[in-house]
């Protein structure tokens, strides 16, 4: 469990949980705020053959570990995500993945949401090859989101399959019940995705196609075409605007000297000799 700079009694609560648990729990303190920092801290100290990333507002379904063991029985070298359901039916149906059929990623679909970061798995050898999460992305970072999508794009560029399976379920208690909250999150996701377009312009130019397809859909929406999400009344236009904003923000970060190498080889080397937690 990673405590990502909490200022309340989280550390004491984690210690209580660890002491009462029937399995070994390693508590990792990561003072730098940001989801990507937390993911990297956990990944660096993980001991298992298979890494499982979930979020702090998610509950793992009872069959999860059995599903996980079955899917990795053959030692697949993939990035694999599972179903994400609402943890509370009162929350709005956003940041969920309910497809009932298995899927394999291709550039014909946008990678955002194909596998959600709150339910993403891979073998440690795969993580070693891809490297660390880009800490400029994700909640609490300048680019606000898309650290998981960036990871999928990097995996695909390396020839690592990205798969979705309709089991391996987690329940997401995101707590958002007002449309305004979903609109803010929608814009945040779009900002991160715009940054990805510029970051991967050379290695994944197909991302730009999705931007132009969104522009086309936005123009059609103006002429009484369908919205991006009719049920939640989410428009294509904020996606266009925030994609451009995200690309501009990424450019500023790069020009300011904060760019990180995509492969991050020093982390890939570190995963093979994982640091043991306290």
Descriptions of predicted regions:
Residues 184-191, 198, 202-278:
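Non-catalytic, C-terminal membrane-associated alpha-helical segments of glycosyltransferases
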């Amino acid at each position: 469990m990673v405590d990502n700079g909490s200022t309340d009694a989280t550390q004491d609560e984690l210690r209580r949980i660890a002491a009462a648990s029937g399995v070994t729990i390693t508590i990792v303190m990561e003072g730098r705020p940001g989801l990507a920092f937390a993911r990297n801290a956990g990944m660096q100290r993980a001991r298992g053959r298979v890494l499982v990333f979930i979020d702090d507002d998610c509950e793992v379904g009872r069959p999860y570990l059995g599903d996980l063991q079955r899917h990795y029985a053959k030692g697949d070298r993939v990035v694999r995500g599972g179903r994400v359901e609402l943890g509370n039916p009162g929350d709005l149906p956003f940041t969920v993945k309910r497809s009932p059929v298995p899927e394999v990623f291709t550039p014909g679909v946008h990678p955002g949401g194909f596998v959600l970061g709150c339910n993403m798995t891979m073998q440690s050898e795969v993580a070693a090859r891809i490297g660390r999460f880009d800490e400029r992305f994700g909640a609490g970072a300048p680019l606000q989101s898309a650290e998981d999508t960036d990871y999928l794009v990097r995996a695909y560029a390396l020839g690592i399959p990205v798969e979705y399976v309709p089991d391996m379920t987690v329940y997401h208690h995101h707590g958002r019940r007002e449309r305004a909250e979903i609109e803010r999150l929608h814009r945040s996701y779009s900002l991160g995705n715009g940054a990805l377009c510029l970051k991967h312009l050379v290695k994944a130019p197909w991302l730009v196609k999705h931007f132009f397809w969104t522009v086309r859909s936005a123009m059609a929406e103006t002429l009484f075409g369908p919205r991006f999400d009719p049920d939640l009344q989410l428009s294509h236009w904020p996606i266009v605007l925030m994609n451009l904003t995200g690309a501009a923000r990424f450019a500023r970060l790069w020009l300011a000297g904060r760019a990180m190498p995509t492969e991050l080889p020093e982390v890939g080397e570190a995963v093979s000799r994982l640091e043991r937690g306290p």
